[in-house]
Amino acid sequence: MASSVVFAATGSLSVPPLKSRRFYVNSSLDSDVSDMSVNAPKGLFPPEPVPYKGPKLKVAIIGAGLAGMSTAVELLDQGHEVDIYDSRTFIGGKVGSFVDRRGNHIEMGLHVFFGCYNNLFRLMKKVGAEKNLLVKDHTHTFINKDGTIGELDFRFPVGAPIHGIRAFLVTNQLKPYDKLRNSLALALSPVVKALVDPDGAMRDIRNLDSISFSDWFLSKGGTRASIQRMWDPVAYALGFIDCDNMSARCMLTIFSLFATKTEASLLRMLKGSPDVYLSGPIKQYITDRGGRIHLRWGCREILYDKSADGETYVTGLAISKATNKKIVKADVYVAACDVPGIKRLLPKEWRESRFFNDIYELEGVPVVTVQLRYNGWVTELQDIELARQLKRAVGLDNLLYTPDADFSCFADLALASPADYYIEGQGTLLQCVLTPGDPYMRMPNDKIIEKVAMQVTELFPSSRGLEVTWSSVVKIAQSLYREAPGKDPFRPDQKTPIKNFFLAGSYTKQDYIDSMEGATLSGRQASSYICDAGEELAELNKKLSSSATAVPDELSLV
């Protein structure tokens, strides 16, 4: 979708320059993957799996998103046979991207890698993708109306927890009174306990799932202004909902890691598009080890039966591609779906089980991702003339938050992920995440572009006079699951009551939040359950094979 939007230019601005101080921070993934797990919650940082010595299993995975691919990598490493099926034309799921007819890379969302993404970094190192991450300055930057900038600046010679305490005490995003009350609330949180007892702190944090972060924060002395100016943008960026509607568990999980690990708050972004620099290397790793990925093959139905003792088991997957249909049979079946996907897939009869019925208590959050290409550099606040030239990229190279627009977080991908997004002779490519996305789902794309572009000029007055030369809009009706108070108990374990059927996905039970890290961790947990049950699963398949009636592999479309 192309568009042309122009706003009148204004005079020069007087904006305080950003500090250029730099302090050494350990940004090596080699050390991060090992160091992050030291004195940390065991649920977030599971040990390396022991070598599998049981029978080789044939595994069919539904879904080629990060959870499905994580599961596949772990199972292939243990010697199993893996096939992945996905109805899409590209891999990656919510972390996927594709190229349009004009050569533009379109993403499903804005993907930022927090320093505490230990399991995802481990996966990226395994597949050789760690070199595809670009480390950003160790600051969290807030863009306020009229171009004023607030920061949580973690750049300090002394690490956790001192660097974090200092960042909150000196931030210019909050007024002195709000900073004081903010510090008081955090001092009274399980975050402090995490410094000496990380597993105990995580248990305390889980127990706070039933209340919203706002209710918890205000009860500990925090202020509404702190929520509005700082924590709401962060909450929207993490889970696409605000602090009033987000469980305290989610925010405090992040805080506990930020407080105890110096690098946890350090941000990274991919060199370029996820399809090339994240999903691509994982796919290569899978296929190099004999795994197979079948795109455009969607699962229409889970086939199942019951044994004489009334136990349910899966007998196959009915899948289709255009007019072709077939039955896939395996020893093990894994549904690596998102919330709406798993609800569509599960047989209605399975809802008689509380385990499966609980999943229907979860719902996804709508989100809209907008890309805007400009003929200049929107985030260059110091020099308007420099912002108008197109010989070199200038501006803010980091994830940006804002409390003053409908998009809570955004970035200039031409700066932050230049390999695929910087185009010679063109300027900024803003990628903005509209949260909550509900008001925009029915809005025409051109109206969305116009509204977002107007809000950009309110944040960056220096961008007035620049033209939007190209744009795209991606709407996802149900993205991350809504991590509202009281929903955590409804998240299912990866191991289900059906012996040969497992789940994976960031919505499933794991100690991190719904995210890329959560998806990766869920895949590790699913693989671990499968390997633990290897002997039993192989025996079950022998029993099913001996008693099953012949079913043709290929079915014609009726």
Swiss-Prot record:
Q: What is its main location?
A: plastid
Name the tissues where it is expressed: Highly expressed in leaves. Expressed at low levels in flowers and siliques.
The protein's Enzyme Commission number: 1.3.5.6
Pathway named in the protein's UniProt entry: Carotenoid biosynthesis; lycopene biosynthesis
GO MF terms listed in the record are: 9,9'-di-cis-zeta-carotene desaturase activity
Alphabetical UniProt keywords: Carotenoid biosynthesis, Chloroplast, Chromoplast, Oxidoreductase, Plastid, Transit peptide
Single GO cellular component annotation?
A: chloroplast
Q: Where in the cell is it found?
A: Plastid, Chloroplast; Plastid, Chromoplast
Cofactor binding annotation: Lipophilic quinones such as decyl-plastoquinone or decyl-ubiquinone.
Q: Where is the transit peptide?
A: 1-27
Knockout or disruption consequences = Albino seedling due to defect in pigmentation, growth arrest shortly after germination, altered leaf development, and seedling lethality.
Listed under GO biological process in this entry are: 9,9'-di-cis-zeta-carotene desaturation to 7,9,7',9'-tetra-cis-lycopene; carotenoid biosynthetic process; lycopene biosynthetic process
Q: Which InterPro entries match?
A: Amino_oxidase, FAD/NAD-bd_sf, Zeta_caro_desat, Zeta_carotene_desat/Oxidored
Q: Which cofactor does it need?
A: decylplastoquinone; 6-decylubiquinone
| Cross-referenced Gene3D superfamilies | FAD/NAD(P)-binding domain
| Reaction equation(s) it catalyzes | 9,9'-di-cis-zeta-carotene + 2 a quinone = 7,7',9,9'-tetra-cis-lycopene + 2 a quinol
Q: Domain of life here?
A: Eukaryota
What does the record give as the function of this protein? Plays a crucial role in plant growth and development. Is essential for the biosynthesis of carotenoids. Carotenoids are involved in different physiological processes, including coloration, photoprotection, biosynthesis of abscisic acid (ABA) and chloroplast biogenesis. Catalyzes the conversion of zeta-carotene to lycopene via the intermediary of neurosporene. Shows stereoselectivity toward trans C15-C15'zeta-carotene double bond.
Q: What family is this protein classified in?
A: Belongs to the zeta carotene desaturase family.
Name the PANTHER family for this protein: PROTOPORPHYRINOGEN OXIDASE, ZETA-CAROTENE DESATURASE, CHLOROPLASTIC_CHROMOPLASTIC
Task: Give the protein's recorded name.
Answer: Zeta-carotene desaturase, chloroplastic/chromoplastic
Q: Which species does this protein come from?
A: Arabidopsis thaliana (Mouse-ear cress)
